[in-house]
Amino acid sequence: MKKQLKYWFSLMGLTMSVGLTACSSNQFVFANFESYVSPLLLERAEAKQPMTFLTYPTNEKLINGFANNTYTVAVASSYAVSELQQQGHLLPIDWAKFNLKKTQNGSNQATIQNKEDAKELFTKEIGDISGELLNWGVPYFLQDLVFVYRGEKIQELEGQDVTWSTIIKAIVNHKDRFNNNRLALIDDARTIFSLANVVHHEVKNTTVDVNPTGSTLNYFGNVYESFANLGLKRDNLNTLFVNSDSNIIINELANGRRQGGIVYNGDAVYAALGGDLRDEINENNLPNGDNFHIVQPKHSPVALDFLIINQQQTHFRDAAHQLIYQLALEGADQTAEELLKTDEEKGTSDEDYYTYGAMQNFSYVNYVSPLKNISDETTGIVFKENKQADTKQVVKQQSQSEQQSESAEKEETEQDDFYTATLKSLLKADSLDDKAKKLVDTIKKTYKIKKADNINWANLIEKPITPLQRSNLTLSWLDFKQRFW
């Protein structure tokens, strides 16, 4: 596997810009968050359907883009999907158009026709979360918030049932490690509110829910101040590093300039692999199993993103389904072994070229794929050692029987799981030392988004809020940052 870069990219022949522009509804527009799609895959998709590519920083900008008919296809978090569906802006997903096959008697046979059929493509967690949203969107990636820290282990953060309130207290108790701008957080009002609400409920010992129950400025302010009440404020930590660009935070955690960060698990994994600038990091600061730690709290906000289609652009119905298939579903009904096939001649210095689009996208984005053949704990490529099927090195002069014999031998060998192979490639090593193996274990553990049976997933997913709630949430966030962070 080649080094994966998340630098912003430009592709020949593909028009891209940031934010909303005056796009005609006759233009096919794909909109997404930055660095949230493989450049190689986007190039492949554009070859089939010419398009304009736009980016946006928040779901709120996305909602506006659908309402004013700017976007054809976009990536949206679950609450934005619900809100857009309620407003009548979404075209239903026609699952039959993807021509994916259901598994029957151990083989792929009947075509998937609807959301109920489609559930077999995804992990159990996706089925628990998505519900009726599968009528309106195709799952893209799954994430939850985690805490990353560098250096020696903090004993309070060891164990299975660590809470966010425990993490906040540990940060304050070890402020010599995190003060002076060395604790990083995402500058996103809704995400930080959801986290604050988790802390709020944990402290009050009430049922955890990330969603607001009130709508006043005072209500939102009180929830945000749950952080300050536990000591997470300027008075204790001097200053905090709050930034809206997750890539900056990833790279700062990877090189050790920031000693702690509250990020999504996919970003934590990418930081563990060295981020964008791995080759520039001093060897002593490179992440390893002893100096890079990821804490997955018992209750934590979960985000499931979907690909959706604009109801106002039915003339792009077929092209929209084709794009979604390439980005999220191509290879979804294949075996794990098939999914790993690459074409070395078509790859670049930054990306391997995978035959199937869903694998291409996962290998670049590195967030939790909803697909069973990638993320299932027993059969998915992230956790499973797969049979090695590559026989390209067989010498042409060999007899057919010799080739078949050698092929059979190759098929009996085992190939590393995805992240072991990735780290070996980054280290340019045939094997991993103990620290590297510990880091792989940390990454694979972080990749799993597991909740206890008594925890309701629905309470950890952000739901639509009213315009008044959105306005007061944003104003309260700005006020809280100014006063405390």
Swiss-Prot record:
Lipid linkage positions (S-diacylglycerol cysteine): 23
Major subcellular location class: membrane
Superkingdom of the source species: Bacteria
UniProt cross-references to SUPFAM superfamilies, sorted A to Z: Periplasmic binding protein-like II (SSF53850)
Keyword Signal: yes
Signal sequence bounds: 1-22
Subcellular location: Cell membrane
Residues linked to a lipid group, N-palmitoyl cysteine type: 23
Alphabetical list of Gene3D superfamilies matching this protein: Periplasmic binding protein-like II
Topology versus the membrane: Lipid-anchor
Any one of the GO CC terms: plasma membrane
Keywords: Cell membrane, Lipoprotein, Membrane, Palmitate, Signal
Protein name per UniProt: Uncharacterized lipoprotein MG045 homolog
Taxonomic classification: Bacteria, Bacillati, Mycoplasmatota, Mycoplasmoidales, Mycoplasmoidaceae
